[in-house]
């Protein structure tokens, strides 16, 4: 079983200036000041005894094909890492998962990628996780 724990964060200033639409058109670039909190998003990944995919969050999904998952961030992280069958993924948050402004969806995406890459036998570095999570989050919105 793989367990990943990713901190949530609070941004003090500069939110949005780290997006390409801003910093690519600005001669000053972008700068965000934020702080990680002692609250986390926990992700577990474990092998199933069949080829189905089970995802537990505020809901439970069990599908034969990961493409049928409703949870877009989980589905896209699975696609990117190549872990697409015979797996159980569970997410648990120390905070409410919507509307807190603490970057919980970003922390979830990083945690998913970290756990799934590790499950697949890879060791992603922080830059890879950040780039992949950013890509998933931007494409999802």
Pin down the residues of each PLM region.
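ATP-binding N-lobe of GHMP and related small-molecule kinases
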Residues: 1-104, 114-124, 135
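Alpha/beta catalytic cores of group-transfer enzymes, especially the acyltransferase/condensing modules
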Residues: 124-141
């Amino acid at each position: 079983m793989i367990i990943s724990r990713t901190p949530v964060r609070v941004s003090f200033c500069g939110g949005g200036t780290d997006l390409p639409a801003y910093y690519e058109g600005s001669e000053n670039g972008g700068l965000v000041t934020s702080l990680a909190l002692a609250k986390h998003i926990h992700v577990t990944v474990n092998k199933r005894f069949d080829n189905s995919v089970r995802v537990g969050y505020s809901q439970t999904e069990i599908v034969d094909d990961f493409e049928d998952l409703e949870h877009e961030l989980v589905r896209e992280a699975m696609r990117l890492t190549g872990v697409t069958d015979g797996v159980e993924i569970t997410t648990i948050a120390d905070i409410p998962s919507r509307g807190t402004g603490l970057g919980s969806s970003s922390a979830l995406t990083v945690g998913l990628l970290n756990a799934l890459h590790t499950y697949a036998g890879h060791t992603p570095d922080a830059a890879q996780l950040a780039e992949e999570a950013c890509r998933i989050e931007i494409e999802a919105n």
